[in-house]
A protein has these predicted regions:
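Cytosolic covalent-transfer regions centered on His/Cys nucleophiles
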Residues: 1-152
Length: 152
């Protein structure tokens, strides 16, 4: 998986305004997946319900969230991963500073194998030295494109 995949599928969203809260952030972060008909809005409600029940499992490392729910969801229409960046960190748990995120990678997959593959590929990509810091510095789709052109 490469960053250019997000750009080629028009799934990059640099949010100009901070989210009101983590629920609002999830709604906004998945906007491109809804717009391009990979998911229905009900999928976001499933993710919100899962976070309310299980805690902020979607924050995989400080600063990065990977919103996803069950693969068997009738609200998933296709397989895709989006990218959204907020200007300020979104707090998921005010008692745990590690449970905040500014970078969101919403996932949708029709196939359980592909879902696990996408999670693994995304996790591997995010372990690239310095990539998270570079993504945090992105302030526009053009910045994102420049990051890709620079070889990230």
């Amino acid at each position: 998986m490469l960053l250019k995949d997000f750009l080629e599928k028009d799934l990059v969203d640099i949010r100009p305004e901070p989210a009101k809260d983590w629920r609002d952030a999830l709604q906004q972060a998945a906007g491109k997946l809804i717009e391009h008909k990979y998911i229905l809005p009900g999928y976001i409600n499933e993710i919100i319900a899962n976070v309310e029940k299980n805690g902020p499992y979607i924050v995989i490392v400080p600063g990065v969230a990977m919103p996803h729910a069950m693969v068997e969801s009738e609200n998933v229409l296709g397989t895709a991963i989006g990218f959204a960046k907020f200007p300020e960190p979104v707090i998921f748990d005010s008692d745990d500073p590690d449970k905040q995120a500014q970078l969101f990678f919403p996932l949708a997959a029709k196939d359980p194998k592909q879902h696990l593959q996408n999670i693994g590929d995304l996790s591997d990509m995010l372990m690239t030295e310095g990539l998270i810091d570079k993504l945090l510095a992105v302030n526009s789709v053009d910045d994102f494109k420049a990051l890709i052109d620079a070889g990230s």
